Curated annotation (Swiss-Prot):
InterPro entries: Znf_LIM (IPR001781). The gene is limF. The keyword Magnesium does not apply. GO terms for molecular function: zinc ion binding. Involved in the regulation of phagocytosis. May repress ChLim and activate rab21. This is LIM domain-containing protein F. Residues 7-68, 77-139, 141-197 form the LIM zinc-binding domain. The keyword Repeat applies. Interacts with ChLim and rab21. It holds the Pfam family LIM. Keywords: LIM domain, Metal-binding, Phagocytosis, Repeat, Zinc.
Length: 197
């Protein structure tokens, strides 16, 4: 026996001398030790692993577990980015009415996580925003109309960046839509819409 690797069961820590069961993590088990936590039947594919406890569940019992925890998951809500439900006692980052897993909210520029540190936000729609960490804020282009960052679609007019809603007529304050004609007041270097021209 010397020189051979002795395989031990991950659950009972005893040597495996007969049939070896290997799970997706390459852990080895006795056949009688690799069983469902709920019903104690030997596990075959497919099976599920609880990420928090490491316990294994057969497909039938996983369905039962999901049904039992559904009201709790729905009451906790879900992440505005990945749409996965929050777990009980999980840290959640809330910005306005949007809720995020801590690991989901990232800087649009450097992709580092944004936790509770200082950040900048550009609202794209009522449910979609771009975020920028403080380190990257100085690196991004700013809108010439509102002076906030431009992370999403921008309009280039008169050699400057604008949010689509910030490029406005200097006289009447109407938004000048992309590809619409406008003129530039040479004295003030400001745009005028076709009506005010």
């Amino acid at each position: 026996m010397s020189g051979q690797n002795i395989l031990k069961c991950k659950k009972c820590q005893l040597e495996i001398t007969n049939k070896i069961i290997t799970n997706h993590n390459s852990d080895t088990f006795h056949e009688q030790c690799f069983v469902c936590k709920l019903c104690s039947t030997p596990i075959s594919d497919p099976y599920f692993t609880d990420k928090e406890t490491g316990d294994f569940y057969c497909a039938k019992c996983e369905v039962i577990r999901n049904d039992q925890s559904k009201p709790l998951r729905e009451s906790l809500g879900f992440c505005s980015l990945c749409y996965k439900y929050f777990r009980q006692n999980e840290d959640i980052l809330t910005i306005d009415l949007e809720r995020y897993h801590i690991g989901c909210l990232k800087c649009t520029i450097c992709k580092k996580g944004i936790n509770n540190e200082k950040y900048y936000r550009e609202k794209m729609t009522s449910k979609l925003s771009n975020y920028c960490c403080e380190d990257c804020f100085e690196k991004v282009d700013k809108c010439n109309g509102c002076n906030s960052m431009t992370l999403g679609q921008t309009l280039l007019a008169m050699g400057k960046n604008y949010h689509a809603n910030c490029f406005k007529c200097f006289k009447c304050s109407e938004i000048i839509k992309p590809n619409s004609p406008y003129s530039i007041n040479k004295q003030t270097n400001t745009p005028s819409c076709q009506k005010c021209n």
